[in-house]
């Protein structure tokens, strides 16, 4: 998972073909003008999920993880923070699709 801003995207070029495709798309299209929901860039290989998320404080945070896809998180409005942990906890709920959440007391923000 990569969490960063648009201005730093080129730092991640060359890591992976599909990531390069996503970066090239985001650098040539205004992410703030994308419709909410899924925008396909290269079918199932590269797509963008645009959401208007409800932000939470760093208390009670549940780390997100993915089994199939890499995740590039961009904060378009400049109001989101991220946390991480190197000590994942137990899985919360049923893992469906590609996204799951864990209960972890060691999240660093």
Give a label for each model feature.
Residues 46, 53-56, 77-81, 89:
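Short, charged/polar surface micro-motifs in flexible loops or helix N-caps
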Residues 1-50, 62-65:
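A short, N-terminal "cap"/entry segment at the start of jelly-roll beta-barrel domains
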